[in-house]
């Protein structure tokens, strides 16, 4: 997936912002990270997103996907080989990560995401 398409999809989610941080692009919903693109210049070197422990087991069984460094164990994965997840599947995982993070926000803030 191309960088511009990945950024556009993530930014299409409600109240999403992006900052350059930790050598990549960090996407946040109301200041809570839900997705990260790691970069070498303009080249994607991986993506990181949140998942449930059950999803973690399913995802890390695939080659090219492992525990995201510096993130909660069994809750965040890093995809190094984007070919492992086709574009629709990656978009679904990004959306799922957004939903998991948004679910932890206050009810008042959650109402602004609809």
Please report, for each region that a protein language model flagged, where it lies by residue:
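Charge-dense, helix-prone N-terminal extensions
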Residues: 1-114
């Amino acid at each position: 997936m191309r960088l511009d398409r990945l950024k556009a999809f993530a930014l299409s989610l409600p109240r999403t912002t992006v900052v350059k941080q930790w050598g990549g692009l960090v996407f946040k919903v109301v200041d809570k990270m839900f997705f990260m693109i790691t970069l070498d210049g303009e080249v994607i070197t991986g993506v990181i997103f949140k998942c449930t422990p059950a999803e973690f087991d399913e995802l890390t069984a695939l080659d090219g996907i492992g525990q995201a460094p510096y993130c909660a164990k069994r809750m965040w994965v890093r995809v190094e080989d984007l070919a492992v997840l086709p574009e629709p599947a990656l978009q679904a995982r990004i959306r799922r990560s957004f939903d998991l993070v948004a679910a932890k926000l206050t009810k008042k803030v959650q109402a602004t995401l609809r």
